[in-house]
Amino acid sequence: KKNCAAISSSLSAKIYKLNILAEQIEDYKNNMTRFYVIGKQKNSISGNDKTSIAFAAKDRVGILYKCLEPFAKNKISLSKIESRPYKNVAWNYVFFIDFFGHIDDPKIQAVLKKLDNYCSFIKYLGSYPVCCDI
């Protein structure tokens, strides 16, 4: 298809007759790459889901604790947390978290409502069935 791209192995490129634009794009020998399927529809609840969100916390003492506390109180496990500098505001950060549960679960909705009290924005990135353990 035109206007499509993929990051894959050279074997996949051969099987699917794809043109290789760049090889060995990793910058770290033992890196792991996350792959996303981007679409316009939400996945329905599978019963074994993860959700990814991004948020910028308001700048206050203890704010990250306040943001994560609702997850802990509701026994929602985080599987990943990363921070990146927020380009629009010096010394502020955007946090990316993955957690177990689906966006349509009322318990998750309640946690995100509490989180919203401490954030300048929250962006839902997706809910998806858990693939496998690495």
Predicted regions and their residues:
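Domain-level signature for soluble enzymes in the chorismate/prephenate branch of the shikimate pathway
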Residues: 1-134
